[in-house]
């Protein structure tokens, strides 16, 4: 149901064998009602919230509602969850009906160290141990600057233009390299006359009167993307 709108259903009573002519349900998994046509066909109607509808995936003749990323496979599916080892879902129809279920996998503590080298550079050492419940590790870099660049073994691997959000890097593709080398990062200072400043959200614009605020690594973290089989 769209936000701000109250869903309503109205049926032609001449076509009903049982059920009401008019329904005004509250969106959610408890909103189910049933009507039966004169031909004896029973129809169950559930009105989901907007968020539930956006998180819905159709699997064969069932629906799956989850915030996790869904990878369908034959006879099963894989759920991917960024940073959360508990994955909530609703699978319907099933023996649980519309009741929410939870899959929990063992939590993992990523292995990572980072240190600043001057005001514009830093070095990150990260390990990617194999765990059956981890699909991939992601490096999140919270920084302020104009452009950030990532190097390994002297070569530029990636760059990122600042827009106020963390720089997220999937590490699986660098697995073999990270076993040999650390990642080196460099950021170029953000200038107060940069033409795109007006396009940035207010919280992303630094205080240029404070030294170093326009060129700084603020926080670095490694987040595991958990996986579970449903």
Listing of model-derived features with the role each one plays in the protein:
Residues 1-230:
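Non-catalytic C-terminal accessory domains or segments of carbohydrate-active enzymes
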